[in-house]
Amino acid sequence: MFLVPDVVVLFFHRMASPPHFYAFTERLMPWLVAIFVLLTAAGLYGGLYLAPADYQQGDSYRIIYIHVPSAWMSLFIYVVMAIAGAIGLIWRIKLAEIVAISSAPIGASFTFIALFTGSLWGKPMWGTWWVWDARLTSELILLFLYLGVIGLYGAIDDKRVASKAVAILALVGVVNIPVIHYSVEWWNTLHQGPTVTKIDKPSIHVSMLIPLLLMALSFKFYYLIALLQRTRLELLRRERNSQWVKTMVLENK
């Protein structure tokens, strides 16, 4: 049986406490921002200046440094949202509920960016802005799922009830994630097959791959920063009548 070290259990137990979470993330934020800026600068410099032009697409392929990480993040964030929703639904942990709903607008933004940049890339490559193939359609459904979560949460006044409804919707929508991921393998679509996640060897040159991975990591740090900021704001809104919030406000005056 796998035993979790006591220090890890204690850390997550403390993070479930709103005042400890708020104080810890406040100290963490400058470091996250610094790492995000460095990763973004390195990724963009490598992708836009150091990486060679593609032998078929020329320089137009460079949109992948925004498009591909955004598409990856659209899936990643939805999974995080669903897991957080499940934790909040089962164990009724307030922070998990807040993480779930706070993830939705960020995930919707990444999904929109993926669809928009994909259209920009598709016009010169495919000769059309949009086609109703499996990958594009399932990604559009993902955007509607995010918007549905946001709309459902806003429509219910009791936010604990709203969090439960959002969690159920997010869990139902998880079925769309493997459809998006495997759509290019299950159906005949205009999208090419996997080039980075191939088990044997990525088919993208290392000079193009490294900046792409840097941008993907950069986007994850951006998500973490945005998530923590939104979570902190929602936490203050829900806990505004709590003693720790009143004490913090008095100390900061």
Which ranges hold each PLM region?
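Polytopic transmembrane helical bundles with strong interfacial aromatic enrichment
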Residues: 2-253
